[in-house]
Amino acid sequence: MATPWSLTAVEVDNVVFPPAVKPPSSADTFFLGGAGVRGLQIEDKFVKFTAIGIYLHDDALPFLAAKWNGKSDHELTESVEFFRDIVTGPFEKFMQVTMILPLTGQQYSEKVSENCVAIWKSLGIYTDAEAKAIDKFVSVFKDETFPPGSSILFTVSPKGSLGITFSKDGSTTTVIENKLLSEAVLESMIGKHGVSPAAKQSLASRLSGLFKAGGDTDK
C-alpha cells in the first residue's frame, strides 16, 4: 500500500490542516484524509461556521482499499456505504474542528447531539446508554466558548471511546466510553446527512488517489 506521507496540506477558509498530525490521546501519527467547511445557506448567503479536518490511522488504507480501490472520486462521494466504512472501520480517527465564527460550547454540543440522536433513531439503536453518553458530551462543552481560530479535537478509538480535547492551553482530554457516540460524532460530519459535503468530497478524492497509488506500487 502506498504511503500517505506524500499527501499535501489542505487549506479551508484560511485554516491550514497539515498532512499529518499526532493526536493528543494517541501515540501514533495520522494522515489527513480530507478537510472541508461546515456552513449553512442563510437566505442568499452561505455562512461558514467551522473548518473540519479528518485524519486517519495508517491502518485505514489497506482496510478501505480492499473494498474501494478502483472507484472514482464521484462514486466514492456518492456512496453512503464508503463513509460508513470510514466511520465504523477498525482503525483510529482524529477530527479537528476549527472555528471560523465564534460559537459557545452549548451551541456546538447541542447541534452535534441533535444530529447524533437523529442518526441513532433512524437506525433504531437509541438506548439509555446513548442518552447518558449524550448528557456527558453536552456537559463537557457546557462552560466553553470558542473564538475564531480555536479548535475542538476528537479522537475516536475502534475499541469504542471518544476523546475530547480543546486547543486552549492546559486543556485535558475527556474520554467518553460509548462506541455509538464515538462513531456518531464522525458520522454527523461525513455520513448520509453529514454537515460537511466539502469534507466528504475531499476524503473521496484524496483516498481514491491513495488507493490508485497503492495499486500501482504493488504491481
Swiss-Prot record:
Substrate binds at residues 50, 115, 188. GO terms for biological process: flavonoid biosynthetic process. It catalyses: a chalcone = a flavanone. GO terms for molecular function: chalcone isomerase activity. Keywords: Flavonoid biosynthesis, Isomerase. Pathway: Secondary metabolite biosynthesis; flavonoid biosynthesis. The keyword S-adenosyl-L-methionine does not apply. Signal peptide: none annotated. Its EC number is 5.5.1.6. InterPro entries: CFI, Chalcone_isomerase, Chalcone_isomerase_3-sand, Chalcone_isomerase_bundle_sf, Chalcone_isomerase_sf. The record marks 108 as: Important for catalytic activity. It is an enzyme of class 5 (isomerase). It holds the Pfam family Chalcone. Catalyzes the intramolecular cyclization of bicyclic chalcones into tricyclic (S)-flavanones. Responsible for the isomerization of 4,2',4',6'-tetrahydroxychalcone (also termed chalcone) into naringenin. Belongs to the chalcone isomerase family. Part of the biosynthetic pathway for all classes of flavonoids, a large class of secondary plant metabolites, many of which are brightly colored. This is Chalcone--flavanone isomerase. The lineage of its organism: Eukaryota, Viridiplantae, Streptophyta, Embryophyta, Tracheophyta. The gene is CHI.
